């Protein structure tokens, strides 16, 4: 969720808008900023559609994908890496798979330089849920499906967490596919056709 991560998101997300679903791999996300920009971009609804004279349709906003999503998390994700899956769950955006995040999300922090060259950060705020409870600092975000990153499988070239989230998103594609509204039947927009419609 750093500035670099936001640039990568835009590049990778827009490059794959034609896919039927998405998997957000936020394992090892060391943080940076809160995830509102990420989630606003990935969960934009289609407000209406345009059908152009040349026969192509577009959505408005034009950069949307309403297919199902899933997220991967692990114990190396913290701070903004806690915030992204936390917000993903708050928005009911899709299943979360993997291992619990670190739980070091406190809030926006300011940095202070020390005279020995070191530094400290001091959070000026703390996050809490819409239900009025504090974010579970020290606990982190627990996955919907706990899957251990088994090193025995990894050395075989497998990724058990990825395999599980792919299965979950593929299952969602069968029950909750993305919204793709076809254009209505063409109308006779001549004066004669419009008169018939209005009578």
Which stretches of residues belong to each language-model region?
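Cleft-lining beta-strand/loop regions that shape enzyme active-site pockets
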Residues: 1-118, 153-161, 167-175, 199
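Gram-negative outer-membrane assembly/targeting C-terminal domains
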Residues: 171-199
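Juxtamembrane/interface motifs at transmembrane-helix termini
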Residues: 142, 156-158, 183-186
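Metal-dependent DNA phosphodiester-chemistry modules and their immediately adjacent helices/loops
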Residues: 77-79, 114-146
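C-terminal or mid-to-C-terminal helical accessory/interaction module adjacent to the motor/catalytic core
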Residues: 146-153
